[in-house]
């Protein structure tokens, strides 16, 4: 039930553990901060982390005549969330499903959730280019996907996988909105100086190679990590941080390509 959704953005990563879900949740919160109504769909069936990151674990989803009702983060209902994590009794419960069952669940998430009118739907995907991604692209053909944001870390081993992700996007006809380099440097929580602990500028170099925008470079900032488990936006808590600056830039980028 995506008829009421104006803009659909897919967040991808070639490798797991690069902070894609953190980027997805904080981007959703940043869009809400800018006055938009936002939906966040977590289709990482085997590693759903969005409920934890937003402090929504233990919340229930319900069925209505129109389908599943998403979980709202507050009474304003400006951020709606759907994740398989809400269907699991325990965060440690594994999802042991073969491909066809995963495909069926993702189709349900995309067609049977009662999203109200949304300015943006952010889809947080699992890493890689698997059945889940193909299913998403097939389901979005009718309504259209407005683009993908690819998250990477600066190490070469991660960049190799992102090159595959870029090829996947081109073959499936997804517009790449840009690349975000995450975990580039460590911000000292005391003096806030940033020190590179991995290689640097890998995301920018890859964006140049692929001829797509480089949306920004996010450091490892312990102050951002503390926000996990809440619906607090970096824009509110750390407005002068590099993370807030990059998120603001991405929001402005989305405004330029969005359907109003």
Curated annotation (Swiss-Prot):
Keywords: 4Fe-4S, ATP-binding, Cytoplasm, Iron, Iron-sulfur, Metal-binding, Nucleotide-binding. InterPro entries: Mrp-like_CS, Mrp/NBP35_ATP-bd, NUBP2/Cfd1_eukaryotes, P-loop_NTPase, YlxH/NBP35. One of its GO terms (biological process) is iron-sulfur cluster assembly. Its cofactor is [4Fe-4S] cluster. GO terms for cellular component: cytosol. Binds 4 [4Fe-4S] clusters per heterotetramer. Contains two stable clusters in the N-termini of Nubp1 and two labile, bridging clusters between subunits of the Nubp1-Nubp2 heterotetramer. ATP binds at residues 14-21. It is found in: Cytoplasm. PROSITE patterns: MRP. [4Fe-4S] cluster binds at residues 188, 191. Its main location: cytoplasm. PANTHER family: CYTOSOLIC FE-S CLUSTER ASSEMBLY FACTOR NUBP2, NUCLEOTIDE-BINDING PROTEIN NBP35 YEAST -RELATED. Component of the cytosolic iron-sulfur (Fe/S) protein assembly (CIA) machinery. Required for maturation of extramitochondrial Fe-S proteins. The Nubp1-Nubp2 heterotetramer forms a Fe-S scaffold complex, mediating the de novo assembly of an Fe-S cluster and its transfer to target apoproteins. Heterotetramer of 2 Nubp1 and 2 Nubp2 chains. This is Cytosolic Fe-S cluster assembly factor Nubp2 homolog. It comes from Drosophila erecta. The lineage of its organism: Eukaryota, Metazoa, Ecdysozoa, Arthropoda, Hexapoda. The gene is Nubp2.
């Amino acid at each position: 039930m995506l008829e009421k959704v104006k803009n659909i953005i897919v967040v991808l990563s070639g490798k797991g553990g690069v902070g894609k879900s953190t980027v997805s949740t904080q981007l959703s919160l940043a869009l809400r901060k800018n006055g938009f109504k936002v939906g966040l769909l977590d289709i990482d069936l085997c590693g759903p982390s969005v409920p934890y990151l937003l402090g929504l674990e233990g919340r229930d989803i319900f069925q209505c005549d129109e389908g599943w009702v998403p979980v709202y983060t507050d009474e304003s209902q400006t951020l709606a969330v759907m994740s398989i994590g809400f269907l699991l009794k325990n965060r440690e419960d594994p999802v042991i499903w073969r491909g066809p069952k995963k495909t069926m669940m993702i189709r349900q998430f995309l067609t049977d959730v009662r999203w109200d009118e949304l300015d943006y739907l952010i889809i947080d995907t699992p890493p890689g280019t698997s059945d889940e991604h193909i299913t998403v692209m097939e389901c979005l053909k009718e309504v259209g996907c407005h683009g993908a944001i690819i998250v990477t870390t600066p190490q070469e081993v991660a960049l190799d996988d992102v090159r595959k992700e870029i090829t996947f996007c081109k073959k499936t006809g997804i517009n790449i909105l840009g690349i975000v380099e995450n975990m580039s440097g460590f911000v000292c929580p005391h003096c806030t100086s940033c020190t590179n602990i991995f290689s640097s500028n890998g995301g920018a170099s890859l964006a140049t190679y692929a001829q797509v925008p480089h949306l920004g470079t996010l450091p490892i900032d312990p102050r951002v990590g503390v926000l996990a488990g809440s619906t607090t936006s970096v824009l509110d808590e750390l407005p002068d941080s590099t993370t807030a600056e990059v998120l603001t830039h991405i929001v402005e980028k989305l405004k330029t390509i969005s359907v109003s």
